[in-house]
């Protein structure tokens, strides 16, 4: 694939092409993400790697000063489509593509992340081509413990990285925003992004 050509095309008529990168196309792409896997560039942090997150992050193929913005999701509430588990990686990739095409962020400065903790979507979990963990989602306590490790290790490796939480369940979106907002350079797009746009209008 040719990343330069992709962004050249998208930016040649941004308003016309945005729907190809994000809503509505990204929703269908996420639903079928495991079935049309094309080696996307994104970081999967699996709950089965708890205790080894630092090593997983170190495998990201960029210099330690390169990533400037990350979009992180657990795939639990993708758009209006519900729990898509690991397939939620597509939403992180799509959102960062908007930042590249619309805001001039360099592609090498982006970091799409999916926190794979399983899925409660049984149909997806049982699909023979599904690439995520085939287990139900953990308790909130176990999830918080894992995400705490992720945030700590991401910040230690990339202290200037802005971390955007995207499409988490409402319960966990508010929980993590309250937990991390004064500790790390992070925000929740679904809560703060929407509110900011309304206030700006």
Feature roles, as predicted:
Residues 1-201:
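Metallocofactor- and cofactor-centric catalytic cores in central/energy metabolism, strongly enriched
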């Amino acid at each position: 694939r040719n990343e330069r050509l992709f962004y050249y095309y998208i930016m040649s008529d941004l308003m016309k092409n945005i729907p190809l990168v994000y809503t509505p196309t990204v929703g269908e792409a996420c639903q079928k993400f495991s079935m049309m896997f094309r080696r996307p560039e994104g970081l999967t942090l699996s709950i089965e790697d708890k205790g080894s997150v630092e090593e997983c992050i170190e495998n990201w193929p960029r210099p330690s000063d390169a990533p400037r913005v990350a979009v992180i999701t657990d795939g639990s509430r993708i758009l209006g489509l519900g729990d898509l588990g690991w397939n939620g990686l597509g939403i992180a990739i799509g959102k960062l593509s908007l930042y590249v095409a619309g805001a001039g962020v360099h592609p090498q400065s982006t970091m799409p992340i999916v926190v794979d903790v399983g899925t409660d979507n049984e149909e997806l979990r049982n699909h023979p081509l599904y690439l995520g963990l085939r287990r139900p989602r953990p308790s909130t306590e176990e999830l918080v413990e894992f995400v705490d490790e992720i945030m700590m290790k991401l910040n230690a490796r990339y202290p200037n990285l802005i971390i955007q939480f995207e499409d988490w369940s409402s319960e966990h979106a508010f929980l993590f925003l309250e937990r991390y907002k004064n500790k790390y350079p992070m925000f929740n797009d679904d809560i703060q992004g929407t509110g900011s746009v309304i206030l700006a209008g």
